[in-house]
């Protein structure tokens, strides 16, 4: 599933081609996504795009009278293409733009979403979200406060959007390795220093992934069709049995809350 770096990479890739341009019309080839594509998106016509923003794993296209909310789901990606490029099997939604280009949404598993809302505030998919991990609001002190009485393993707690948004399975594993913290540790057992290290590790790992265009393991592509190159820098995720890049110990794998987790037994305590 695309996580924060992949969604932010998509935002940065499409923004220069959309802001200041007008949506001439939408083409919805298959509206049966996680939720049906909103009727207002089917009917789009002559709508300028004012901004392209991101909240958590949602892309937000601001129009004069409302917002398009896009979620990439498990296998979605967005590309900027020439208008004349023929659609392929899994290309479900196009926004045809005034500059001769299309914003094309591709999603083999159809678990993404295209929603419409007049107002962002209070929309059910955006309500009750924690802070952005790259914001000043997310820091060691905040993490310590939220972990202090939490009797759950730190790995699944990091993936809870009420704690912090956008940190999915890949980046939770990578951040815990960078901070030297075992994924089985109870959140409440983390010291003030460990919380500070973990907050900084999360920021550093996410920023590095954004620099590399995100992580492509299967379906994700950047807006120009290229894969994300952070996959080449993964320290533990997907490397079961391979030697740790730091100490040489074989990487271990297990499950936490039904999600695959990877760690080094020597580097993470």
UniProtKB/Swiss-Prot annotation:
Q: How is the cofactor bound?
A: Binds 1 zinc ion per subunit.
| Superkingdom assignment | Bacteria
Q: Which residues form a coiled coil?
A: none
A GO biological process held by the record: base-excision repair
Instruction: Provide the active-site residues from the annotation.
Output: 2 (schiff-base intermediate with dna), 3 (proton donor), 57 (proton donor), 259 (proton donor)
EC number(s) on record?
3.2.2.23, 4.2.99.18
Q: Kindly indicate whether the keyword Nucleus belongs to this entry.
A: no
- Which UniProt key words apply to this protein? DNA damage, DNA repair, DNA-binding, Glycosidase, Hydrolase, Lyase, Metal-binding, Multifunctional enzyme, Zinc, Zinc-finger
Q: What Gene3D superfamilies does its record include?
A: 1.10.8.50, MutM-like, N-terminal
Recorded catalytic activity of this chain's protein: Hydrolysis of DNA containing ring-opened 7-methylguanine residues, releasing 2,6-diamino-4-hydroxy-5-(N-methyl)formamidopyrimidine; 2'-deoxyribonucleotide-(2'-deoxyribose 5'-phosphate)-2'-deoxyribonucleotide-DNA = a 3'-end 2'-deoxyribonucleotide-(2,3-dehydro-2,3-deoxyribose 5'-phosphate)-DNA + a 5'-end 5'-phospho-2'-deoxyribonucleoside-DNA + H(+)
The question of whether Repressor is a record keyword is answered with no
* Chain sites annotated for binding DNA: 90, 109, 150
Q: Which SMART domains match?
A: Fapy_DNA_glyco (SM00898), H2TH (SM01232)
- Zinc fingers (FPG-type): give the ranges: 235-269
Cofactor(s) the protein needs:
Zn(2+)
InterPro entries assigned to the protein according to its UniProt record, in alphabetical order: DNA_glyclase/AP_lyase_DNA-bd (IPR015886), Formamido-pyr_DNA_Glyclase (IPR020629), FPG_cat (IPR012319), MutM-like_N-ter (IPR035937), Ribosomal_uS13-like_H2TH (IPR010979), Znf_DNA_glyclase/AP_lyase (IPR000214), Znf_FPG/IleRS (IPR010663)
Q: Which Pfam families match?
A: Fapy_DNA_glyco (PF01149), H2TH (PF06831), zf-FPG_IleRS (PF06827)
Q: Which GO molecular-function terms appear in the entry? A: 8-oxo-7,8-dihydroguanine DNA N-glycosylase activity; class I DNA-(apurinic or apyrimidinic site) endonuclease activity; damaged DNA binding; zinc ion binding
SUBUNIT field = Monomer.
Q: What does this protein do?
A: Involved in base excision repair of DNA damaged by oxidation or by mutagenic agents. Acts as a DNA glycosylase that recognizes and removes damaged bases. Has a preference for oxidized purines, such as 7,8-dihydro-8-oxoguanine (8-oxoG). Has AP (apurinic/apyrimidinic) lyase activity and introduces nicks in the DNA strand. Cleaves the DNA backbone by beta-delta elimination to generate a single-strand break at the site of the removed base with both 3'- and 5'-phosphates.
Q: State the family named in the UniProt similarity comment for this chain.
A: Belongs to the FPG family.
This one is known as: Formamidopyrimidine-DNA glycosylase
Q: What is the lineage of its organism?
A: Bacteria, Pseudomonadati, Pseudomonadota, Gammaproteobacteria, Enterobacterales
